[in-house]
Amino acid sequence: MKEFIESRYNLFLEDLQTLVNIDSGSSYTPGIKEIAIFFKKRFEAIGFKTTILLLGDEKIPCLKAWNKSEKTRSDIMFLGHMDTVFPYGEVKKRPFFIKDGKAYGPGVCDMKGGLLVSLHVLETLKEKGVLDDLSVLVAFNGDEETGSNSSRDWIFSNAKKSKRVFVFEPCRPGYRFVLKRKGYGWFRIIVHGQAAHAGAEPNKGINAVVELARQILAIDKLNSPGSGVSAQVTIIKGGNKLNIIPDKAIAEVDIRIANFEGEKKAESFFEILPEKPFLKNVKISVEGGICRPPMVPDQNVFNLWDIVRAKAKENNLEICHISTGGCSDGNFTTAAGVPTIDGMGLVGTNMHRKDEYIELESINNIILLIAKVCKHICEHRK
Protein backbone atom coordinates (compact mmCIF):
# COMPACT_ATOMS: atom_id res chain seq x y z
CA MET A 1 0.00 0.00 0.00
CA LYS A 2 2.70 2.45 1.01
CA GLU A 3 4.47 2.42 -2.35
CA PHE A 4 1.21 2.86 -4.26
CA ILE A 5 0.16 5.79 -2.07
CA GLU A 6 3.56 7.47 -2.33
CA SER A 7 3.53 7.11 -6.12
CA ARG A 8 0.32 9.14 -6.24
CA TYR A 9 1.46 12.05 -4.08
CA ASN A 10 1.72 14.48 -7.00
CA LEU A 11 -1.71 13.40 -8.24
CA PHE A 12 -3.10 14.16 -4.79
CA LEU A 13 -1.65 17.68 -4.94
CA GLU A 14 -3.09 18.20 -8.42
CA ASP A 15 -6.49 17.03 -7.22
CA LEU A 16 -6.27 19.25 -4.15
CA GLN A 17 -5.43 22.29 -6.25
CA THR A 18 -8.41 21.55 -8.51
CA LEU A 19 -10.82 21.29 -5.58
CA VAL A 20 -9.54 24.27 -3.60
CA ASN A 21 -9.73 26.47 -6.69
CA ILE A 22 -13.48 25.88 -6.96
CA ASP A 23 -15.58 28.36 -4.98
CA SER A 24 -18.00 26.23 -2.99
CA GLY A 25 -19.32 28.43 -0.21
CA SER A 26 -22.54 27.21 1.36
CA SER A 27 -24.57 29.78 -0.58
CA TYR A 28 -22.95 29.02 -3.96
CA THR A 29 -24.61 25.79 -5.07
CA PRO A 30 -23.04 25.71 -8.59
CA GLY A 31 -19.62 25.35 -6.97
CA ILE A 32 -20.82 22.68 -4.55
CA LYS A 33 -22.30 20.76 -7.47
CA GLU A 34 -19.00 21.05 -9.36
CA ILE A 35 -17.25 19.47 -6.39
CA ALA A 36 -19.86 16.70 -6.33
CA ILE A 37 -19.38 15.99 -10.04
CA PHE A 38 -15.60 15.74 -9.55
CA PHE A 39 -16.04 13.03 -6.93
CA LYS A 40 -18.91 11.34 -8.75
CA LYS A 41 -16.67 10.64 -11.76
CA ARG A 42 -13.80 9.35 -9.65
CA PHE A 43 -16.00 7.10 -7.51
CA GLU A 44 -17.67 5.66 -10.59
CA ALA A 45 -14.23 4.92 -12.05
CA ILE A 46 -13.57 2.49 -9.18
CA GLY A 47 -16.92 0.75 -9.45
CA PHE A 48 -19.14 2.77 -7.13
CA LYS A 49 -22.73 3.61 -7.91
CA THR A 50 -23.43 7.29 -7.34
CA THR A 51 -26.20 9.83 -7.18
CA ILE A 52 -26.31 13.57 -6.64
CA LEU A 53 -29.35 14.63 -4.64
CA LEU A 54 -30.76 18.14 -4.27
CA LEU A 55 -32.06 18.38 -0.72
CA GLY A 56 -34.37 20.88 0.94
CA ASP A 57 -36.01 24.02 -0.37
CA GLU A 58 -32.62 25.41 -1.35
CA LYS A 59 -31.79 22.30 -3.42
CA ILE A 60 -28.50 21.65 -1.66
CA PRO A 61 -26.27 19.29 -3.70
CA CYS A 62 -25.35 16.14 -1.79
CA LEU A 63 -23.40 13.18 -3.13
CA LYS A 64 -23.96 9.55 -2.24
CA ALA A 65 -21.75 6.71 -3.46
CA TRP A 66 -21.82 3.01 -2.58
CA ASN A 67 -20.11 -0.14 -3.83
CA LYS A 68 -22.33 -2.94 -2.50
CA SER A 69 -26.01 -3.70 -2.10
CA GLU A 70 -27.95 -1.09 -0.17
CA LYS A 71 -30.04 -3.86 1.37
CA THR A 72 -27.33 -4.60 3.95
CA ARG A 73 -25.48 -2.27 6.33
CA SER A 74 -22.22 -0.93 4.94
CA ASP A 75 -19.03 -1.81 6.80
CA ILE A 76 -17.98 1.85 6.86
CA MET A 77 -19.57 5.18 6.06
CA PHE A 78 -17.26 7.96 4.85
CA LEU A 79 -18.78 11.33 5.77
CA GLY A 80 -17.77 14.82 4.71
CA HIS A 81 -19.01 18.19 3.48
CA MET A 82 -18.34 19.95 0.20
CA ASP A 83 -19.25 23.49 1.27
CA THR A 84 -16.94 26.07 2.81
CA VAL A 85 -17.57 29.25 4.80
CA PHE A 86 -16.06 31.48 2.12
CA PRO A 87 -18.08 33.62 -0.32
CA TYR A 88 -18.01 33.42 -4.09
CA GLY A 89 -14.90 35.13 -5.42
CA GLU A 90 -12.61 34.09 -2.57
CA VAL A 91 -10.61 31.75 -4.82
CA LYS A 92 -9.75 34.57 -7.20
CA LYS A 93 -8.37 36.58 -4.27
CA ARG A 94 -6.21 33.78 -2.87
CA PRO A 95 -6.01 30.60 -4.93
CA PHE A 96 -4.26 27.41 -3.86
CA PHE A 97 -0.54 27.67 -3.17
CA ILE A 98 2.20 25.74 -1.39
CA LYS A 99 4.84 27.25 0.89
CA ASP A 100 7.20 25.80 3.50
CA GLY A 101 5.64 22.36 3.61
CA LYS A 102 2.08 23.62 3.84
CA ALA A 103 -0.78 24.05 1.37
CA TYR A 104 -3.07 27.06 1.59
CA GLY A 105 -6.36 28.13 0.04
CA PRO A 106 -10.09 28.43 0.78
CA GLY A 107 -11.30 25.21 2.39
CA VAL A 108 -7.99 23.37 1.95
CA CYS A 109 -8.23 22.11 5.53
CA ASP A 110 -11.97 22.36 6.17
CA MET A 111 -12.47 20.14 4.43
CA LYS A 112 -11.46 19.62 0.82
CA GLY A 113 -8.27 17.92 1.91
CA GLY A 114 -10.30 15.47 3.96
CA LEU A 115 -12.71 14.72 1.12
CA LEU A 116 -9.75 13.95 -1.10
CA VAL A 117 -8.24 11.67 1.53
CA SER A 118 -11.40 9.56 1.47
CA LEU A 119 -11.22 9.28 -2.33
CA HIS A 120 -7.55 8.32 -2.40
CA VAL A 121 -8.11 5.78 0.38
CA LEU A 122 -10.82 4.12 -1.70
CA GLU A 123 -8.71 4.22 -4.85
CA THR A 124 -5.92 2.53 -2.89
CA LEU A 125 -8.28 -0.12 -1.54
CA LYS A 126 -9.58 -0.74 -5.06
CA GLU A 127 -6.05 -1.22 -6.38
CA LYS A 128 -5.25 -3.70 -3.59
CA GLY A 129 -8.49 -5.67 -4.00
CA VAL A 130 -9.91 -4.77 -0.58
CA LEU A 131 -13.11 -3.33 -2.05
CA ASP A 132 -13.97 -6.76 -3.41
CA ASP A 133 -15.21 -7.59 0.08
CA LEU A 134 -15.45 -4.29 1.98
CA SER A 135 -18.68 -2.32 1.65
CA VAL A 136 -18.37 1.46 1.85
CA LEU A 137 -21.04 4.15 1.73
CA VAL A 138 -19.91 7.71 0.99
CA ALA A 139 -22.05 10.69 1.96
CA PHE A 140 -20.91 14.24 1.16
CA ASN A 141 -23.36 17.04 1.99
CA GLY A 142 -23.33 20.67 0.92
CA ASP A 143 -24.70 22.57 3.90
CA GLU A 144 -22.63 21.54 6.92
CA GLU A 145 -21.22 25.00 7.48
CA THR A 146 -24.74 26.40 7.86
CA GLY A 147 -25.97 23.67 10.18
CA SER A 148 -26.82 20.77 7.83
CA ASN A 149 -30.47 21.82 8.04
CA SER A 150 -31.41 20.18 4.74
CA SER A 151 -29.15 17.14 5.04
CA ARG A 152 -29.22 16.08 8.70
CA ASP A 153 -32.05 13.55 8.25
CA TRP A 154 -30.27 12.16 5.19
CA ILE A 155 -27.04 11.81 7.17
CA PHE A 156 -28.85 10.18 10.08
CA SER A 157 -30.55 7.70 7.75
CA ASN A 158 -27.32 6.74 6.00
CA ALA A 159 -25.52 6.35 9.33
CA LYS A 160 -28.20 3.92 10.46
CA LYS A 161 -27.35 1.83 7.39
CA SER A 162 -23.68 1.63 8.42
CA LYS A 163 -21.70 -0.23 11.07
CA ARG A 164 -19.23 2.60 11.72
CA VAL A 165 -18.52 6.13 10.50
CA PHE A 166 -15.33 7.98 9.61
CA VAL A 167 -15.73 11.76 9.42
CA PHE A 168 -13.09 13.51 7.33
CA GLU A 169 -12.97 16.81 9.17
CA PRO A 170 -9.39 18.05 9.75
CA CYS A 171 -7.02 16.12 11.97
CA ARG A 172 -5.45 18.51 14.47
CA PRO A 173 -1.69 19.22 14.52
CA GLY A 174 0.12 16.44 16.31
CA TYR A 175 -2.19 13.85 14.72
CA ARG A 176 -4.99 14.53 17.17
CA PHE A 177 -8.22 12.87 16.12
CA VAL A 178 -11.65 13.72 17.53
CA LEU A 179 -13.82 11.32 19.49
CA LYS A 180 -15.89 13.81 21.46
CA ARG A 181 -17.59 17.07 20.51
CA LYS A 182 -19.93 19.35 22.35
CA GLY A 183 -23.45 19.70 21.07
CA TYR A 184 -24.74 23.07 19.93
CA GLY A 185 -27.91 25.10 20.21
CA TRP A 186 -29.13 28.66 20.28
CA PHE A 187 -32.03 30.41 21.94
CA ARG A 188 -33.56 33.84 21.46
CA ILE A 189 -35.42 35.33 24.43
CA ILE A 190 -37.95 38.02 23.52
CA VAL A 191 -39.41 40.11 26.34
CA HIS A 192 -42.47 42.34 25.87
CA GLY A 193 -43.19 44.96 28.52
CA GLN A 194 -45.00 48.30 28.48
CA ALA A 195 -43.58 51.60 27.27
CA ALA A 196 -43.96 54.72 29.42
CA HIS A 197 -42.32 58.09 29.99
CA ALA A 198 -39.17 57.39 31.98
CA GLY A 199 -39.46 60.62 33.97
CA ALA A 200 -43.15 61.51 34.23
CA GLU A 201 -44.83 58.09 34.50
CA PRO A 202 -42.27 55.33 35.06
CA ASN A 203 -44.75 53.50 37.28
CA LYS A 204 -46.99 52.91 34.25
CA GLY A 205 -44.22 51.12 32.42
CA ILE A 206 -43.01 47.52 32.48
CA ASN A 207 -39.28 47.59 31.79
CA ALA A 208 -38.44 44.82 29.32
CA VAL A 209 -34.70 45.46 29.75
CA VAL A 210 -34.90 44.92 33.52
CA GLU A 211 -36.81 41.67 33.01
CA LEU A 212 -34.29 40.52 30.45
CA ALA A 213 -31.38 41.41 32.73
CA ARG A 214 -32.79 39.20 35.47
CA GLN A 215 -33.38 36.38 33.00
CA ILE A 216 -29.77 36.68 31.84
CA LEU A 217 -28.55 36.23 35.41
CA ALA A 218 -30.72 33.11 35.65
CA ILE A 219 -29.33 31.82 32.35
CA ASP A 220 -25.79 32.36 33.60
CA LYS A 221 -26.43 29.92 36.44
CA LEU A 222 -26.60 27.14 33.85
CA ASN A 223 -22.81 27.42 33.72
CA SER A 224 -22.29 25.83 37.13
CA PRO A 225 -19.38 23.33 37.27
CA GLY A 226 -20.34 19.85 36.16
CA SER A 227 -23.61 20.96 34.61
CA GLY A 228 -22.59 19.86 31.13
CA VAL A 229 -23.89 23.17 29.79
CA SER A 230 -22.14 26.30 28.54
CA ALA A 231 -24.66 29.13 28.10
CA GLN A 232 -23.23 32.38 26.76
CA VAL A 233 -25.41 35.43 26.17
CA THR A 234 -23.77 36.98 23.12
CA ILE A 235 -26.30 39.51 21.78
CA ILE A 236 -28.55 41.93 23.67
CA LYS A 237 -30.96 44.48 22.23
CA GLY A 238 -33.34 46.73 24.13
CA GLY A 239 -34.66 50.26 24.19
CA ASN A 240 -34.42 52.96 21.55
CA LYS A 241 -34.73 56.28 23.39
CA LEU A 242 -33.21 57.48 26.63
CA ASN A 243 -36.46 58.82 28.09
CA ILE A 244 -38.75 55.87 27.30
CA ILE A 245 -39.20 52.75 29.42
CA PRO A 246 -38.32 50.00 26.92
CA ASP A 247 -41.23 47.78 25.96
CA LYS A 248 -39.12 45.17 24.18
CA ALA A 249 -35.79 43.49 24.78
CA ILE A 250 -34.06 40.57 23.09
CA ALA A 251 -31.15 38.35 24.03
CA GLU A 252 -29.51 35.57 22.06
CA VAL A 253 -27.75 32.71 23.77
CA ASP A 254 -25.08 30.35 22.42
CA ILE A 255 -25.44 26.91 24.01
CA ARG A 256 -22.79 24.18 24.10
CA ILE A 257 -23.59 20.86 25.71
CA ALA A 258 -21.06 18.26 26.82
CA ASN A 259 -23.39 15.32 27.36
CA PHE A 260 -26.96 14.15 27.02
CA GLU A 261 -27.80 15.23 30.56
CA GLY A 262 -26.70 18.75 29.67
CA GLU A 263 -28.87 18.66 26.56
CA LYS A 264 -31.94 17.77 28.62
CA LYS A 265 -31.12 20.42 31.21
CA ALA A 266 -30.80 23.19 28.62
CA GLU A 267 -33.96 22.21 26.76
CA SER A 268 -35.97 22.03 29.98
CA PHE A 269 -34.67 25.38 31.21
CA PHE A 270 -35.64 27.32 28.10
CA GLU A 271 -38.94 25.48 27.70
CA ILE A 272 -40.24 26.75 31.05
CA LEU A 273 -38.50 30.15 30.98
CA PRO A 274 -41.60 31.99 29.62
CA GLU A 275 -43.55 30.73 32.62
CA LYS A 276 -41.12 32.25 35.13
CA PRO A 277 -41.07 36.06 34.68
CA PHE A 278 -39.63 38.28 37.39
CA LEU A 279 -41.92 41.27 36.71
CA LYS A 280 -45.71 41.30 36.67
CA ASN A 281 -47.60 41.48 33.37
CA VAL A 282 -44.52 40.89 31.26
CA LYS A 283 -44.70 38.48 28.33
CA ILE A 284 -41.79 36.28 27.32
CA SER A 285 -41.32 34.07 24.27
CA VAL A 286 -38.42 31.79 23.37
CA GLU A 287 -37.19 30.73 19.94
CA GLY A 288 -34.48 28.29 18.90
CA GLY A 289 -33.41 24.94 20.22
CA ILE A 290 -30.65 22.34 20.21
CA CYS A 291 -29.28 22.06 16.67
CA ARG A 292 -26.68 19.34 17.14
CA PRO A 293 -26.65 16.73 19.91
CA PRO A 294 -23.39 16.11 21.78
CA MET A 295 -20.94 13.62 20.34
CA VAL A 296 -20.22 11.33 23.28
CA PRO A 297 -18.07 8.22 22.71
CA ASP A 298 -19.09 4.84 24.11
CA GLN A 299 -17.11 1.61 24.41
CA ASN A 300 -17.77 0.74 20.76
CA VAL A 301 -16.05 3.96 19.75
CA PHE A 302 -13.05 3.21 21.94
CA ASN A 303 -12.87 -0.31 20.48
CA LEU A 304 -12.72 1.24 17.01
CA TRP A 305 -10.13 3.72 18.21
CA ASP A 306 -7.96 0.84 19.42
CA ILE A 307 -7.78 -0.40 15.82
CA VAL A 308 -6.79 3.05 14.54
CA ARG A 309 -4.15 3.40 17.22
CA ALA A 310 -2.71 -0.07 16.53
CA LYS A 311 -2.39 0.64 12.81
CA ALA A 312 -0.78 4.00 13.55
CA LYS A 313 1.77 2.24 15.74
CA GLU A 314 2.58 -0.12 12.86
CA ASN A 315 3.38 2.98 10.81
CA ASN A 316 5.47 4.53 13.61
CA LEU A 317 2.90 7.30 13.84
CA GLU A 318 2.06 8.75 17.23
CA ILE A 319 -1.60 9.71 17.47
CA CYS A 320 -4.06 10.69 20.17
CA HIS A 321 -7.70 11.70 20.50
CA ILE A 322 -9.22 14.90 21.85
CA SER A 323 -12.50 16.55 22.79
CA THR A 324 -13.51 19.82 21.13
CA GLY A 325 -16.24 22.42 21.48
CA GLY A 326 -16.79 22.68 17.74
CA CYS A 327 -19.49 20.60 16.05
CA SER A 328 -19.58 18.45 12.93
CA ASP A 329 -21.95 16.03 11.26
CA GLY A 330 -20.32 13.39 13.43
CA ASN A 331 -22.61 14.69 16.17
CA PHE A 332 -25.55 13.29 14.19
CA THR A 333 -24.00 9.90 13.44
CA THR A 334 -23.04 9.41 17.08
CA ALA A 335 -26.61 10.31 18.09
CA ALA A 336 -27.74 7.63 15.64
CA GLY A 337 -25.88 5.13 17.81
CA VAL A 338 -23.17 4.40 15.24
CA PRO A 339 -19.50 4.30 16.37
CA THR A 340 -17.87 7.40 14.92
CA ILE A 341 -14.32 8.68 14.66
CA ASP A 342 -13.87 12.26 13.51
CA GLY A 343 -10.87 14.27 12.39
CA MET A 344 -9.87 11.70 9.76
CA GLY A 345 -8.81 14.38 7.30
CA LEU A 346 -5.41 15.96 6.72
CA VAL A 347 -3.50 17.53 9.57
CA GLY A 348 -4.15 21.26 9.54
CA THR A 349 -5.52 24.23 11.39
CA ASN A 350 -6.80 27.83 11.21
CA MET A 351 -10.14 26.70 9.81
CA HIS A 352 -12.43 29.50 8.58
CA ARG A 353 -9.43 31.86 8.34
CA LYS A 354 -7.39 33.22 5.46
CA ASP A 355 -4.28 31.47 6.79
CA GLU A 356 -5.96 28.05 6.88
CA TYR A 357 -3.50 25.33 5.88
CA ILE A 358 -2.74 21.61 5.79
CA GLU A 359 0.61 19.95 6.49
CA LEU A 360 1.87 18.25 3.34
CA GLU A 361 3.75 15.55 5.23
CA SER A 362 0.44 14.31 6.63
CA ILE A 363 -0.96 13.38 3.21
CA ASN A 364 0.67 9.98 2.77
CA ASN A 365 0.58 9.27 6.51
CA ILE A 366 -3.18 9.77 6.83
CA ILE A 367 -4.08 7.94 3.62
CA LEU A 368 -1.93 4.95 4.60
CA LEU A 369 -3.31 4.87 8.14
CA ILE A 370 -6.96 4.90 7.09
CA ALA A 371 -6.38 2.44 4.27
CA LYS A 372 -4.81 0.00 6.74
CA VAL A 373 -7.68 0.48 9.19
CA CYS A 374 -10.17 -0.28 6.41
CA LYS A 375 -8.20 -3.36 5.38
CA HIS A 376 -8.21 -4.58 8.99
CA ILE A 377 -11.97 -4.07 9.22
CA CYS A 378 -12.41 -6.01 5.99
CA GLU A 379 -10.28 -8.90 7.23
CA HIS A 380 -12.20 -9.08 10.51
CA ARG A 381 -15.72 -8.66 9.17
CA LYS A 382 -18.45 -10.43 11.10
Language model features with spans:
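Short glycine-aspartate micro-motif
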Residues: 75-77, 103, 163-167, 188
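Glycine/serine-rich anion-binding loops at beta->alpha junctions
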Residues: 86, 102-116, 197
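Acidic/histidine-rich catalytic neighborhood of metal-dependent amide-processing enzymes
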Residues: 111-182, 378, 382
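Metal-dependent amide/peptide-bond hydrolase catalytic core
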Residues: 7, 24, 56, 170-173, ...
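Short beta-strand segments
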Residues: 79-80, 139-141, 166-169, 190-192, ...
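Acidic/His- and Gly-rich active-site-bordering loop/insert found
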Residues: 1-106, 127, 330
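A structural signal for isolated positions on well-ordered beta-strands in alpha/beta enzyme cores
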Residues: 77, 135-139, 285
